[in-house]
Amino acid sequence: MIGMNALGSNGRLGNQMFQYASLVGIAKNLGYDYCIPDHSKVTWFDRMEGDEIITQHHQLQHLFEMNNLGDRFGLIEGGNEIHLEQAEFCKELFDECPHNSTLYGYFESYHYFENAEEELRKDFVIRDHILSAAEKFHKDNKTDHPACISVRRG
């Protein structure tokens, strides 16, 4: 079993999705099971420290169906802590990650999870209440010239 005990404390949603996807892909490559912390009961995700917003909990269970995840919740206790510092794909980690390890890092390469596309597509299905709210917003704010702005913080 491998896990990501700190999922949610190392980046916001995009990073969390990459981290989870990488965990699934690495586990699949090595034939391991995997787990993530259960944050289903969390009602807040960030805290302020001075001028900084610190992310504490992952949002995946709140935003996505996570159909493939099942009940794979938990923490890796007393195992290896693997801190990935590099941005590029680490083939050694992908092929030789030790059993009973928790992963920490950004995992900024699709190569970690290109083998798990089917599983991840089942997990990353947006929850109905979010889709409904988005559809209502678009219906209520219909315009001939829609625009989208993405604000990157950090």
What are these regions (language model features)?
Residues 32-43:
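A short beta-strand-loop structural module common to alpha/beta enzyme folds
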Residues 43-154:
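Secretory-pathway luminal glycosyltransferase catalytic domains
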Residues 7, 37-38, 150-151:
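Short His-Asn-centered micro-motif
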Residues 8-18:
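A short, glycine/small-residue-rich beta-strand->loop->alpha-helix junction that serves as a flexible
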Residues 25-34, 69-70:
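Structural alpha-beta junctions
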Residues 1-6:
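Extracellular/lumenal mucin-like low-complexity stalks
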